[in-house]
Amino acid sequence: MSEMVDLKKFLTELGKTQKELKNVIEQAKDIGLELKTNSKMTPEQAGKLYKYIVDGIKEQIQANKPTKNPEQDNKDDLNITATPKPLNKKVSKTPKKEETKSQPKPKKTKEKKKEAPALIAKKKGGIEIVNTFEDQTLENTPKVVSHSQIEKAKQKLQEIQKSREALSKLTQSNTNNANSTNNANNVNNAKKEISEVKKQEQEIKRHENIKRRTGFRVIKRNDETENETENSVAESKKPTQSAAAIFEDIKKEWQEKDKQEAKKAKKPSKPKATPTAKNNKSHKIDFSDARDFKGNDIYDDETDEILLFDLHEQDNLNKEEEEKEIRQNINDRVRVQRKNPWMNESGIKRQSKKKRAFRNDNSQKVIQSAISIPEEVRVYEFAQKANLNLADVIKTLFNLGLMVTKNDFLDKDSIEILAEEFHLEISVQNTLEEFEVEEVLEGVKKERPPVVTIMGHVDHGKTSLLDKIRDKRVAHTEAGGITQHIGAYMVEKNDKWVSFIDTPGHEAFSQMRNRGAQVTDIAVIVIAADDGVKQQTIEALEHAKAANVPVIFAMNKMDKPNVNPDKLKAECAELGYNPVDWGGEYEFIPVSAKTGDGIDNLLETILIQADIMELKAIEEGSARAVVLEGSVEKGRGAVATVIVQSGTLSVGDSFFAETAFGKVRTMTDDQGKSIQSLKPSMVALITGLSEVPPAGSVLIGVENDSIARLQAQKRATYLRQKALSKSTKVSFDELSEMVANKELKNIPVVIKADTQGSLEAIKNSLLELNNEEVAIQVIHSGVGGITENDLSLVSSSEHAVILGFNIRPTGNVKNKAKEYNVSIKTYTVIYALIEEMRSLLLGLMSPIIEEEHTGQAEVRETFNIPKVGTIAGCVVSDGVIARGIKARLIRDGVVIHTGEILSLKRFKDDVKEVSKGYECGIMLDNYNEIKVGDVFETYKEIHKKRTL
């Protein structure tokens, strides 16, 4: 035998509480099952009760099946019966006792049959529960029926058939209307109703497969509906009416309902506030979310239907917690908005409060240990990259003697200091805003010519060697035989091309030499065999080492007598460059630029090294080139010598280089021939630039002129901001001290040169002459001729000068210079320019004063002469004592007085000087406190010029 089902467990399965126990017991009575609070059921009884409560399917339990009342068969077929319990589920809000009293007994109905129709006791707003389904729509809502309704319609048909036999008993007050015709009409109407009910039954079967229920619809049983049921019982006692009369009554009822609904619309009732409304007045919780309630299933206070949600089947247990969080956030937001903005002010302590908050923010920051920053970075950008507080960075620099603002740029030294102070690992990257060249990934890299840079000390024969390679004379065109500009040439050897870059060798052009090393593949260091390694030679080796390029040594001037190549090799070996014949890895090729010996061997060595390196580049795509030199040429405007690194540069291509932009108009090779395109490692002179680009800048080919112009403008804005930021680099203490002592003397200069590379070299050389007392202030520099605007810039200064290199002023400029009293000096050799500016600075500097000791005398006796003063009788112990010379009076090793010897006598005669071992009389100017034992020390002041 199966186990019994406890009623409490049954409630738990239904998702109901103990408060709903009475309703479940009453529903059990509807199917003939008597239950109590602690009762148990068989599984069969529990299943039927579950179907009745959940699905509305009523199956009577045979043991408790109630008997049918025969008196109810006499009721009218179009009215609703009152005595049998309705087949729809009902749950009364009144207690059980009150409900049982309101139900009439069959006996009382039988006794009052011939009297006035007995009314059922008035109920207090019962409710009717109807299942709702997920796919119900607005049209399907009123069609919800159950199997019990179909049984009810069949009972009506049986009652109508029985009413024919009891026709005479029901026609006491209105016999004319109780004829068989009306009964026949009623029968037809009942058949129609049965057919409609069958359609509804099919609709129910369609919904039987839907297991999920969204809730119960509770239909309010108000007084009007109770009156309708009572009236239906009373009317069941009356004789049957005609169909026209019935329709007339229905029409009146609907009109009354419409009037009542109109009154309710004018005076809408306010629903009572739920407990959650106290905590959440502005937030509406939508219980119907994700529950597929459609049509009239949503609760409307104006209707007589209420929807009870079935929440126990949904997995929304955390719904309430989410709603509480939302409600709390809304309350917090409202609380912040209502906050008084002055409630936390504390008078003069407001600033300290902000400082405390500032320190708290700083404590929350996590300092990064390894960062990557661009080469040129501002102070605030460095703080952001390193996740540091800006105030701490500025404070650290201030403690180190640097007065900076957040927009100032940091140099490499400052970055290294900050990295050490904050324990950071910093990698500096050159991330200036440049256009990335679109490389064709599927393109094939092709072999390209090697780029060779000729480097070395001044006058060691670099240009002459390259001239011999090209079989042309170039060095004689350079002033003083010194290369002033970078020269780039293409040389063919064994059907292979080699690109040569000739860099100036003297110290002033170290920047240009460094720039040449950045674009080269192989460095050839030229060293004169009769001169050996010099300072510029060491610098050239350092540049090549920094560029990580292989080095080949060319020992030039081997045609001279008494040369010692082994000595040169030994000097290079001391620097770490061991020759191959000494067991090292560096080639030392003996050459002669005068006779041409060894040049073929040098070229073959270069080509072998290039084959080992396997130099390749992609020829497709936009060009990327390096500007070796820029200048202004008459009739052509701004021109630039470029060497292509990747891609192809053609005539008509748009480009930009730093602040310059334009479109390639013409291209000329080193022999003066016009060409249409440049491939990797090729060199040419291009025209069509908006201005002279700085030497060493990267030229990028772009799609059109608008992109080129935009990128150049961005770069110009960046450089302008960087130049303005340099004004705050001097500390206030240093500046105020120099101004107070009038020690700082400036020489404003305007520098004009024919090429950009020469201009940079001159500027760097002049800035190296600056010191603490005098300084050269470059107020303007540019490429091109001297203009009247240049004169106006320096006209207001006393020592202003305009320096021109390889340019000459016009007649109008010379006349204006005389009016403004401005000196214009032009040069063709950079050495002459630097030496003359050095002399000018030395003239403004105060000379160095040195003392020369001349003699010494000891005081043996003193003589006081009235109206004259004290005369000291002395013996010259060292040197010569002269009249009018400066002397110090020393007593016990301490200088008592410093002055001039006013009178010098030998006995009674005045003398000019007294030699060692002789006696003399000495009188000082305006000083008489001389004692026996004092010492006179005489000296001369010698003024010497400063050196730079």
Swiss-Prot record:
Keyword hit for Cytoplasm: yes
Biased composition (Basic and acidic residues): 68-78, 190-207
Origin superkingdom: Bacteria
GO cellular component: cytosol
Stretches the record annotates as G3: 502-505
Region (G2): 481-485
Start and end residues of each stretch annotated as Disordered: 61-120, 162-243, 255-285
Key word Protein biosynthesis present: yes
An example molecular function term from Gene Ontology annotations: GTP binding
Biased composition (Low complexity): 173-189
CDD domains: IF2_eIF5B, IF2_mtIF2_II, mtIF2_IVc
Sites where the protein binds GTP: 456-463, 502-506, 556-559
Stretches for region G1: 456-463
Chain positions covered by the region annotation G5: 592-594
Polar residues composition bias: residue spans: 230-243
Ranges of biased composition (kind: Basic residues): 208-219
Any Pfam family: EF-G_D2
Keywords tagged on the record: Cytoplasm, GTP-binding, Initiation factor, Nucleotide-binding, Protein biosynthesis
Domain (tr-type G): residue spans on this chain: 447-616
Region described as G4: 556-559
Subcellular location: Cytoplasm
PANTHER family, sorted: TR-TYPE G DOMAIN-CONTAINING PROTEIN (PTHR43381:SF5), TRANSLATION INITIATION FACTOR IF-2-RELATED (PTHR43381)
Known function: One of the essential components for the initiation of protein synthesis. Protects formylmethionyl-tRNA from spontaneous hydrolysis and promotes its binding to the 30S ribosomal subunits. Also involved in the hydrolysis of GTP during the formation of the 70S ribosomal complex.
Protein name (Swiss-Prot/TrEMBL): Translation initiation factor IF-2
